[in-house]
Amino acid sequence: MAALSSGSSAEGASLFNGDMEPEPPPPVLGACYAGSGGGDPAIPEEVWNIKQMIKLTQEHIEALLDKFGGEHNPPSIYLEAYEEYTSKLDALQQREQQLLESMGNGTDFSVSSSASTDTVASSSSSSLSVAPSSLSVYQNPTDMSRNNPKSPQKPIVRVFLPNKQRTVVPARCGVTVRDSLKKALMMRGLIPECCAVYRIQDGEKKPIGWDTDISWLTGEELHVEVLENVPLTTHNFVRKTFFTLAFCDFCRKLLFQGFRCQTCGYKFHQRCSTEVPLMCVNYDQLDLLFVSKFFEHHPISQEETTLGETTPASGSYPSVPPSDSVGPPILPSPSPSKSIPIPQPFRPADEDHRNQFGQRDRSSSAPNVHINTIEPVNIDDLIRDQGVRGEGAPLNQLMRCLRKYQSRTPSPLLHSVPSEIVFDFEPGPVFRGSTAGLSATPPASLPGSLTNVKALQKSPGPQRERKSSSSSEDRNRMKTLGRRDSSDDWEIPDGQITVGQRIGSGSFGTVYKGKWHGDVAVKMLNVTAPTPQQLQAFKNEVGVLRKTRHVNILLFMGYSTKPQLAIVTQWCEGSSLYHHLHIIETKFEMIKLIDIARQTAQGMDYLHAKSIIHRDLKSNNIFLHEDLTVKIGDFGLATVKSRWSGSHQFEQLSGSILWMAPEVIRMQDKNPYSFQSDVYAFGIVLYELMTGQLPYSNINNRDQIIFMVGRGYLSPDLSKVRSNCPKAMKRLMAECLKKKRDERPLFPQILASIELLARSLPKIHRSASEPSLNRAGFQTEDFSLYACASPKTPIQAGGYGEFAAFK
């Protein structure tokens, strides 16, 4: 501010009050004025002085904006100076306009008008002291050579925001109203989609579009108001001590003592209070508003409805949503480089990198689990990108999960080649791709990996000589012994399984109840006459499935290849979650529903830790024992869930459309299935649990659902959840159902959030009352001898046994 007010105020006042002789205007300007009419000859000098004052005032305003315009809470002296400069600028411009109009009409000025000019110039110069060096710059302006002088437009637009706030934005040509106000709205916790903007014209508010060029509105006042249907409230902050692990929603640092909004759940440190969004927006209902507004202006025609009948994998599916769509299209992110095997989505850009190893014939020992397994990622990028979303997503839980990955991987296969896969059994060369015939020969050790490891190579090399194999005796003994844990040991010969009644059919096969050393479930897969490549790929996937052992996973017991491919799993006494929720409509208590969600997340976390993508998670594949123990089935098996052409494997749209993620429906990527696509399906399962309904129940057209979900126009209606559903569960559901794949959390975070929610629920403990003493081992005869009545129990005569004193 000191720089802005530098210079001698006395000099500025004397200059514009006539004490000093001003420099005459340029000849061109004087000639123009002289020819414009027969007015006062002193008018051109007065116009000249006013123009200099306007320029200086505008420079002061621009300097203020450059200095303090980007601050959220600018100092009060800045606001006072800004208001003073803008008011003086308005007065000067009005006076200049009057002078120019009078010159054009040839009228003469009265004494009062010249007096007012002196007053304006004097008041302006008294507050805007101008240095002599600054005046010398503007005494020879270049823009005064125009034949028709016009009033300069105002470079700013005043905007009145919700909650009695206001701001000023520069009016730049080519910049829309949305871009100009985006930062101001974001600082107040708002987005343009939930607001409407109006201009004041003739005393009335007239709506304008967000894409209007703001330079057309120079000098006008805009009013931004929140839409009526948007549930906008103010925060309800309370001070809170977080005894469980929590993180600040702004700085993402550990939070012990801070504040929390009771309405939206936003939590923060006291030092971060200035960065908290000013508005408390219910974004769940906001999504419904966007969908309803879209269909008001874009009704779906019959042609668009039939568009979903085309096969998404063929490339005919629309790929880029229109500008009115809720979210932008999902773009692949760069491939990470570190070697912790945490799941990330497949990226088509890696295919060229894999091809540098060359094309060779497929090895019979190479595991073909490339579709269900994911390359390693950078831990720092994972933590930074995923963050800690919502309550109960602690950072140490994620690090604990990473340690599980290291401890569960005894085989030496941790290296940094993007095309490698981590398994729990001792494999041959490891592949990842969508076609057979690709092979990789990873180096023995690479910098940047956690450990220097050795990997088996297909081609001859020094690493094959790690053990002497020169003697034929050793080779014969190895051939005789073989591998103890071979996948061939899990093949059940034809005729040992007794197939019973048909239970049901799904997308990839038919399930029967069978007998094989007890009750088992036999799933006959829809693969007729498998090729040798398919058969070997199927066996390789079984090599991964046979390692799954978890309380919430259906136990894999074996497989058979004759008369057709079949998977044998344990028999689950009970019904599927779909049958409970939608057929017999079992009424579960909320604590039971949360426990079912916790067990499902626990089982999926285990599968993802094994680098297995479910690909078809839904309530039909979640089974409940009689004690409500969750068992997840029908996981993995990319060989069966893909389309084969000869020896090559291709992706196809598989699964049930209600549980499909938008990127899976679009099928734009070569392999759209990822851990995040399983998370989306889990979000739909949460929706079923918390509403008791299937999503999109109001739409009967299957193709319409495929089209709208794939384009991002449709999402489940979260307003239908039960009234007693915790807010944390509703927020978790919304996170899992994000339209952008990379914005969804992973199952370690989901499991931690649900466990924290389950611990925070109020539980009614049984009181240590008299009936509990009976259960502790006392007999009724023991109480017949003593007076054990409650103080409120009326005493009856003869109720005290055989004591003579009471008779």
Swiss-Prot record:
Entry EC number(s): 2.7.11.1
Positions of post-translational Phosphoserine modification: 790
GO biological process, one term: stress fiber assembly
Residue numbers of Phosphothreonine PTMs: 793
Domain Protein kinase, first and last residues per copy: 497-757
Residues binding Zn(2+) 1: 235, 261, 264, 280
Residues annotated for ATP binding in this entry: 503-511, 523
Basic and acidic residues bias: start-end ranges: 348-363, 463-487
Cofactor: Zn(2+)
SMART domains, per database record: C1, RBD, S_TKc
Post-translational modification remark: Phosphorylated.
Keyword annotations: Allosteric enzyme, ATP-binding, Cell membrane, Cytoplasm, Kinase, Membrane, Metal-binding, Nucleotide-binding, Nucleus, Phosphoprotein, Proto-oncogene, Serine/threonine-protein kinase, Transferase, Zinc, Zinc-finger
Binding site for Zn(2+) 2: 248, 251, 269, 272
Region annotation Disordered: where it falls in the sequence: 1-36, 104-128, 303-372, 434-494
Zinc finger (Phorbol-ester/DAG-type): 234-280
Subcellular location field: Nucleus; Cytoplasm; Cell membrane
Annotated Low complexity bias: 1-15, 110-128, 314-328
RBD domain mapped to chain residues: 155-227
Expression by tissue: Expressed preferentially in neural tissue.
Catalytic reaction(s) noted: L-seryl-[protein] + ATP = O-phospho-L-seryl-[protein] + ADP + H(+); L-threonyl-[protein] + ATP = O-phospho-L-threonyl-[protein] + ADP + H(+)
Keyword Nucleus: yes
Protein's recorded name: Serine/threonine-protein kinase B-raf
Organism, as annotated: Coturnix japonica
